[in-house]
Amino acid sequence: MGEKMYIIGIVGRSYFNKDNQEIFQIHESIRRVLTKYDDILPICLLPTEDYSYHNHIIGKDIVNKDKLDFILDKCDGFIVPGGTYFHNFDEYIINYAIKKDKPLLGICLGYQLMFSMFAKNRNKFDMTLRLKGNSHYGNSKKYLHKVNIIENTRLSKIVNKSCIPVNSVHKDAVMFDMNKLVINAVSDDGVIEGVEYPKRKFIIGLEWHPECLFDEYSKLIFDSFIKSIKKEPK
């Protein structure tokens, strides 16, 4: 294997199997997308603390930071995928990526956590706005609505469109003011669909699931993410 390989750490998600055993997994759709890039190695990132991750949400500091930093230092980029709860483990990785300027893509819950971390009123934001009806919850493999791309954002330069169709599998939304992040996508009903952290190679969060569609716009997003990891021209 002569060519340089790049490691992308995917945050693992916890669930309980039929025997009520806590299992860690990664989203298969994300793994499959990354296998399309020959020089990318996806790995699963696991918590380094001795606790039930499924029940451990934001609030308690990470003790084994040196152990976690050891594996994060090996990664060239990160994906924080969808899930159910905000975790301090996820938050630590997002802060690490920002501090070290390593590319990171937040998807669905990962995006919502990014938004929460930089909200002006964190306690208020931790209870995300509950959407009424199912206007944002559908089949991950099909388009459900469109999002308007904000001009002069990193995302607008990536997709080169003012509006794109997206899938949607979320029942919560974010509509609060925040610090530091830049809004890059909004749906017609006012729901914020994407954000990005300025002055970094690639720190972008999206409410939709580009890994499930992997259409022309999703491919542009992942291509830009990978190029940022390789430090190639965008």
Region locations from a protein language model:
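N-terminal beta1-alpha1 cap of cysteine-dependent amidohydrolase-like domains
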Residues: 1-109, 115-117, 130-158, 171, ...
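Post-Walker A helix-loop "phosphate-sensing" segment adjacent to the P-loop in P-loop NTPases
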Residues: 118-126
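Active-site-proximal beta-strand elements of phosphoester/diester hydrolases
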Residues: 204-208
